């Protein structure tokens, strides 16, 4: 959980030496859970080929992947590319209302009841799906032009290094040294967790919780 710091009292400002993570020159742990609007802002995604597909008639972009592999981050980054887009997340066992949107972005589409899913798939707007299940055959039977992307399948050391650097810079407090994650640690994280970005962030969160000063972070 990311906690943004505020002044402790209108009478007396907080002693900066007692603020969390001030010893690391950070406002907060960079690898805690971020609000959705910041996840989109910090996404490291090449949206160009995805947007090119969505410009095609009856386009559907399908992002498939297990939990923690970046589906929702992709969806939120794409939402920011469209002023009229609508994003709907389907929690387990619930059916939230689905507004009009162009495109319409459906997160956890595998949880949508089949009859509602059929209705949504027939809407005359581009669709962007985050799903654990492949709906290609069903969509093609409806005449949709489907592009499928495996979320997280291109997470390599270069991309992960960029993600990590952006998160640390986002949490930076002032000019000066901050903790850094060397490529040797990036490689170890990929060896241990593969392309599970959420697991990597959790591991880094624990490492940063125990740092005493800005340094090279090692496993």
Q: In which residue ranges do the predicted regions lie?
A:
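AAA+/P-loop NTPase substrate/partner-engagement loops
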Residues: 84-112
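Sensor-1/coupling segment of RecA-like P-loop NTPase cores
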Residues: 112-153
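Amphipathic alpha-helical "lid/sensor" segments that cap RecA-like P-loop NTPase cores
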Residues: 179-219
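P-loop NTPase Walker A phosphate-binding motif
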Residues: 71-88
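Conserved small helical "lid"/interfacial subdomain of P-loop NTPases
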Residues: 150-183
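Walker A/P-loop nucleotide-binding motif
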Residues: 56-75
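Residue-level preference for the first positions of well-ordered beta-strands
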Residues: 60-62, 86, 103, 126
């Amino acid at each position: 959980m990311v906690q943004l710091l505020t002044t402790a009292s209108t009478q007396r400002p907080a002693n900066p030496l007692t603020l969390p993570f001030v010893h690391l020159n950070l406002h907060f742990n960079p690898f805690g859970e971020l609000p959705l609007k910041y996840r989109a802002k910090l996404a490291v995604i090449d949206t160009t080929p995805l947007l090119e597909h969505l410009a095609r008639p009856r386009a559907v972009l399908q992002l498939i992947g297990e939990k923690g592999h970046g589906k929702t981050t992709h969806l939120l980054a794409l939402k920011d590319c469209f002023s009229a887009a609508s994003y709907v997340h389907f929690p387990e066992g619930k059916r939230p209302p689905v507004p009009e949107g162009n495109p319409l972005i459906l997160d956890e589409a595998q949880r949508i009841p089949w009859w509602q899913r059929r209705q949504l798939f027939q809407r005359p707007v581009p669709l962007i799906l985050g799903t654990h299940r492949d709906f290609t055959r069903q969509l093609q039977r409806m005449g949709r032009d489907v592009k499928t992307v495996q979320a997280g399948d291109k997470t390599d050391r270069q991309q992960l290094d960029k993600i990590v650097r952006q998160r640390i810079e986002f949490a930076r407090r002032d000019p000066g040294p901050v903790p850094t994650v060397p490529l040797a640690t990036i490689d170890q994280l990929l060896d241990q967790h593969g392309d599970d970005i959420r697991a990597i962030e959790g591991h880094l969160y624990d490492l940063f919780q125990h740092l005493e000063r800005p340094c090279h972070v090692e496993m």
